[in-house]
Design a protein with these regions (language model features):
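Core SAM-dependent methyltransferase catalytic element
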Residues: 192-193, 201-225
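Short alpha-helix
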Residues: 54, 58, 175-201
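A short acidic, Gly/Pro-enriched loop at the edge of an enzyme's catalytic core
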Residues: 113-126
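Class I SAM-dependent methyltransferase SAM/SAH-binding core
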Residues: 50, 54-57, 61-116
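Class I SAM-dependent methyltransferase Rossmann-like catalytic core
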Residues: 16-63
């Protein structure tokens, strides 16, 4: 897997959401409650088999394992080998119940409350697959992910070019795939909880492209070191 710095410059130190994203960036065509939109279970995959395999390859190459939080989870998590303990947080209880890889399931709407219902340093790694484009307060969510990660824990965000357009934020819909990488890079940088942001891109030949952007919570090292 080719690893590179995430495309585009990171926002300058001290930047705020208003400095980086224009007014209306996080608006959506359908502003109604996500719980209503996702009330009916969708036991289908949202990317093709090649892109699914690419997600699994990213997890394997990065060694995502241990106690892992699968953010905005559903009925499948795309891990070739299930982590030791996988916790799924999503919107639909039926979808989460159908996911055999999950050890624990939490129904929680991040667009209503971006706070994660977990203690500090609860997970070794975290993932978010093809869902980051629906977050209306993503920097708050990324900050929370950093809080619940242990030092050196990675947050791996994967996405393609498919979405539910009425629920995706306006800024995402108006941007191409390279722009999406830059958007996620900005989320990491603005959260203030992660180190260097890395990216992997698979162009896809006639199928769904797959992009991965990730960063780790810094490890401060031993006390007094």
């Amino acid at each position: 897997m080719t690893r590179r710095r995430a495309g585009g410059p990171s926002p300058p130190y001290g930047s705020t959401m208003a400095d980086v994203f224009p007014p209306g960036f996080f608006d959506r065509a359908d502003p109604t409650a996500d719980t209503a939109f996702y009330d009916v279970p969708r036991l289908v995959t949202h990317i093709d088999d090649a892109a699914i395999a690419a997600v699994g390859a990213v997890y394997t190459e990065l060694g995502v394992d241990g106690e892992v939080l699968d953010l905005m989870s559903s009925w499948v998590s795309h891990f070739p080998v299930t982590p030791r303990r996988l916790v799924g947080l999503g919107l639909n209880a039926t979808e989460l119940a159908a996911n055999p890889a999950l050890a624990d399931r939490v129904v929680h709407d991040l667009n209503v409350d971006p706070r994660l219902p977990f203690p500090d340093a609860a997970f070794d790694d975290a993932t978010c697959c093809v869902s980051v484009d629906y977050l209306t307060d993503p920097v708050a969510v990324f900050r929370e992910v950093a809080r619940v990660l242990r030092p050196s824990g990675r947050f791996v965000v994967t996405f393609s070019n498919r979405c539910f357009p009425t629920k995706a934020i306006r800024g995402w819909l108006s941007t191409d795939d390279d722009g999406h990488v830059q958007i996620v890079n900005a989320y990491f940088a603005l959260s203030g909880g992660f180190g260097e942001v890395r990216a992997h891109r698979r162009a896809g030949r006639g199928g769904d492209p797959l992009y991965a952007v990730w960063a780790a919570r810094p490890d401060p090292g031993p006390p007094g070191g």
